[in-house]
Structure formats: C-alpha cells, structure tokens
Amino acid sequence: MAPRWSPDSWRSKLIEQVPVYPDLKKLAEVEQQLATFPPLVFAGEARELKAKLARVAAGEAFLLQGGDCAETFAEHRADAIRDFFRVLLQMAVVLTYAGGSQVVKLGRIAGQFAKPRSAPTEVQNGEELPSYRGDIINGIEFTEEARVPDPQRMLMAYRQSAATLNLLRAFAQGGYANLDHVHRWNLGFVKDSPAGHRYQELAGHIAESLRFMRACGLTPERTPELRTTSLYTSHEALMLGYEQAMTRVDSTSGDWYATSGHFLWVGDRTRSLDQAHIEFLRGIKNPVGAKCGPSLGPDELLRLIDALSPANEPGRLTLICRFGADKVAKLLPPLIRAIKREGKSVVWTCDPMHGNTIKAAGGYKTRPFDLIMREVEAYFDIHRSEGSHAGGVHVEMTGQNVTECVGGSKAVTETNLSDRYHTHCDPRLNADQSLELAFIVSERLKREREGRPEPEISIAAGE
C-alpha cells in the first residue's frame, strides 16, 4: 500500500534541480500568498483532458503538445500568444484531417517558466555565476544580482499565466478558431513553402471537405464546433513550492488537483522514484506525463508507472520519449514490449527535440530539422512494428519567425542562426518548420489510417 500523500509530503524527500533562496522567510511568505490566489484551471477541465487522453491511449485520437522551451516575462505579448495559438491550430487541422480522428491540443504555455539545468553554475569570460533556471526563479542577465533566486518572480509567473490563459480562452471560444480561417492560413503556408507542391494535395482535399460540409449546412456560423476549440495547458512540475501552493481540493470529488495547469510532467532529470517530484505528482489527480530518456530501462519504467498510475487508469499517464534519432530504434522497442507484456495503459508520445540538440560552429545550440524528422519517422515505424499506437508528438515551437533550428524547406543554415536567435534556453521550431512537421506527420497518419477499417459516418443534410 502506498504511503499517505499530502500536497507537502514531497518536502520529506530528496529533491533535485531546486534553487537556493537566500531568504527562506520571504519564500514561505510568497508561497502562502499564492495559496490564497484563485486557481488558474479547474478540476473539471483536467478530468475532461484525461478522458480525451484515454482515447489517445486506446488509439482513437492523437496528442499534439507544443510550445515554448521556456516562457519569459520579456516576451509576454498578445501577438506572440496569438501566433502560437494560430500555428498550433493549423497543425491540428492538418493532423485531424489526415488521421481521421480527434487531435488533442496541449500547449506548453501559461506555466512553462522553470528549466532544469545540467550544471548549477555557468562561466562567461572567466566569471562563474549561478545558472539561469527560468524567469520564475532568476534573471537571464549575466550579473550577480540577476542570478539570485527571487521568490517574487513566482507571483509574476502566476499573473502572467493568468493573463495568458485569459487570452487563450478568448481565442478558443471567440471565433478566432474558425475552421475557415485556419484553412486559409494553411493555404498561405502551402503557397509560400518551397515544398508546397508536396502538401498541395492534402490542402485541396481539406478544401473539398469544407465545401461539402457547407453544402450540408455545416458552417461555422451555424455550428459552434467549427468556430471554437479546446486548448489545454501544460508545463514541467519543477518548482514544487509553487505547485503545492496551487494544489487545491476539488469540491465536487474531494480529490486534490494541481490548478497551475491541466497537465504536469516530470523531467528526465527529476524522475527518481524515491525523490520529491515523483512524490508530488503521484498524489494529484490531473493527467501527468514523464519524460523518458536514454537512461530509462524497462524495469524502471514499470516501477515509474506503478508509482504514477497505480490504478492503470487510461489517460492518466503520458510517456514522452526523448531518445535522439540515433538511439530511438534501440531504446524504444524494449519499453513498448514491457508495457504490452504487463498490460499497462499509457499514451506514447515522441519528443524529437531534446535528443537531437547539437552545437553549431558559431557556438549556438541548434537542432537539425532532418534529425527531428528522422526520430519522428522511426517512432512511427517502431510502434507499427510492435503493434502499439504512436499517440502523439511533443515539440518545442513558436509562432514567430525565429532562426534557431537548422533545416526545413526554407533551409535555415548555421550562418542564419544569429539572425533571429531569441530563445532564452533551447532552440525551437519556427512557424514554418512547425507546419512542415505537421504536414509530414499527417502523411504518416494518413498511411496509418488507410491500414485500418473506416468508421461509419452519418451526416444529416442541412436545410
């Protein structure tokens, strides 16, 4: 029987990736203040997401998870949020049509402020200072003052998350998600992309379907489902003091839910079974995820599942696999076989970003688009050969025209990286690269769909 859990039981465990605050009294005061603030999301929304993820686990839907490597205070602008939302919608429409099933949209947004680091300090020009750990903890400026962890930043992160969520809800329900608009945006991408001829056929089929639905009376003006959408939020549960303060009892069920986001995940560096991050995540009722890197073997994975999803509840646990294009073929199959052998219910999703990071000649971290796509293709191949469901993709992306990942049809090169390299942490796919990934994945989903029986569809004609 699992030990008794409470929102603060993690405090008795060893913890990794925690900042050292110089004034613990001020930290406690901020955490107490956060505990009085309204929730950012609601338990019913988290349950709704879990039900949709259960469909993904059953092979009946696909998960699209994407967003910033790390949100920042400086880049908190309405146009940046709008552009992210637009690109994620464009990706989802293409994947929905090609796969013939629901796409669950999950943003790395409205809470993705903290980042684990490989070293506690960094050196620039011979000077050593604490590492930048995300705007919720300290500043990116390389000064002694900026790098001191400041608990007031948690209050700033809460307020920014609330404002971001408010705008996202308005976009999702206020008509910006109109399917006709999204299709026009995709046509613009196809027209302007050097590889547009490859995607023209799919775009044409979507246009035909929209014309057919309009002829049947299914228009955005008359059908709310064609002008609104659902978008859920997610982030890594790294700052456990913040997460504890935002964890509340649901009045309808009596269960504990994290209200900082709909979906939280544990990172590859903090998933030790006897440590604080797993202890916290095991007790909340939200759907949760776990990053699975090269160091995770089948036996440890099964123990991780037993800790985070002891009831084997469909939709509860998503495994976010991040191996690298050169390792996925060796490391992923044993994990899939162990899950199938033990009858575990999980969502399998592919993070093709973190295992494919390299350093360019100019010193910039980057991710080659061809390596990203090689890992995605291998992920689909492996799941197909193992008889399991390739449930989704998890990408670091932006709606902006940055130059951080090399490659893609518009051929960002290493010499281009300095043009618009804006990330505070890891390189992200830009808008065009994100859409190109979606179109390539859609081709794979179409092949997968053509290999299974078509469901019966009934459409009532309009007036």
Language-model features: locations:
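Short, compositionally biased low-complexity segments
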Residues: 18-22, 54-66, 123-141
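Active-site-facing alpha/beta catalytic cores
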Residues: 70-71, 76-324, 367, 375, ...
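N-terminal basic/disordered segments at the start of proteins
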Residues: 1-62
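N-terminal leader/presequence segments that precede the conserved core
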Residues: 1, 53, 402-403, 463
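A general structural signal for short secondary-structure junctions and capping/turn motifs
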Residues: 53-56, 94-96, 280-281, 382-386
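Glycine-rich, charged/polar anion/phosphate-binding loops
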Residues: 48-50, 274-277, 304, 333-335
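Non-transmembrane, aqueous-exposed alpha-helical and coiled segments at domain scale
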Residues: 301-304, 310, 316-348, 354-403, ...
